[in-house]
């Protein structure tokens, strides 16, 4: 036989998460798990939630069987995890006023600040037993840079690539799960796996009319620098050797203010206005 749900989630911790940036794990399982245990853990602050078990349109069924009302009672302001649920129907938004997955994205505290989660993956149908566990395994592998030649920093990228692994290993059964597994939240969200750190950047505050390049020294590789105006992206570049070089062909033709955002994995973004 295969692994039980509890054993499988322990495997995700032991094989992937424990060797990455995560420093603790709480497995809340039957028969001793409870809603209060789950809510206490989430309110204290967790980065990722893996759920594997029975579920329904309005909640989980095992371990910490939270429901829609419980999610709306969470107080984890500024400590929002992302969630991978293997279970039946938590994303069945089309037949319910508010599905379980929707509740995680809509929850707020008494002041209206977001609680719940930044993203929740849940199926709109009843899931089969084995195929989605292959997908969840791959998502955790990709998340922790353990899947050979496959690194993704976006919530949607991790999920889609995990589903492709499931499709390859499970064939038609995997493809059926992919068709109904739904991302609630922004798939382009760049996730964090650790407490974000500050970093420094050196750059000019002024862009001259006719200037061809804009150079930003960030001291790290893979840092994204983006320039925009009125919500329109004008130029962007990733740093190589700690330096990002941006083409100003669409930027320096006329004077005015330009918004700049500098972002990188597990860091606090730098935002500035250039003139």
Language-model-detected regions and their locations in the chain:
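Cysteine-dependent hydrolase recognition
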Residues: 1-274
């Amino acid at each position: 036989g295969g692994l039980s749900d509890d054993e499988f989630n322990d495997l995700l911790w032991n094989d992937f998460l424990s060797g990455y940036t995560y420093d603790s794990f709480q497995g809340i399982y039957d028969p001793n798990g409870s809603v209060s245990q789950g809510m206490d853990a989430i309110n204290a602050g967790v980065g990722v939630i893996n759920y594997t078990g029975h579920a329904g349109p309005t909640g989980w069924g095992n371990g910490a069987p939270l429901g829609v009302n419980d999610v709306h009672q969470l107080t984890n302001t500024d400590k929002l995890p992302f969630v991978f649920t293997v279970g039946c129907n938590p994303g069945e938004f089309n037949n319910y006023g508010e599905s379980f997955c929707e509740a995680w994205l809509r929850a707020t505290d008494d002041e209206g600040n977001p609680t719940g989660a930044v993203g929740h993956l849940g199926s709109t149908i009843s899931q089969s037993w084995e195929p989605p566990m292959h997908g969840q395994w791959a998502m955790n592998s990709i998340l922790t840079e353990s899947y050979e030649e496959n690194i993704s920093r976006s919530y949607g990228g991790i999920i889609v690539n995990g589903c492709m692994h499931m499709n390859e290993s499970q064939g038609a059964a995997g493809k059926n799960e992919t068709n109904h597994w739904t991302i609630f939240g922004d798939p382009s969200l760049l996730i964090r796996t650790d407490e974000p750190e500050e970093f420094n950047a050196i750059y000019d505050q002024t862009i001259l009319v006719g200037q061809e390049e804009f150079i930003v020294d960030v001291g790290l590789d893979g840092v994204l620098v983006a320039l925009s105006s009125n919500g329109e992206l004008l130029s962007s570049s990733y740093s190589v050797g700690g330096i990002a070089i941006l083409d100003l062909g669409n930027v320096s033709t006329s004077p005015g203010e330009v918004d700049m955002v500098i972002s990188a994995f597990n860091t606090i973004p730098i935002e500035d206005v250039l003139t």
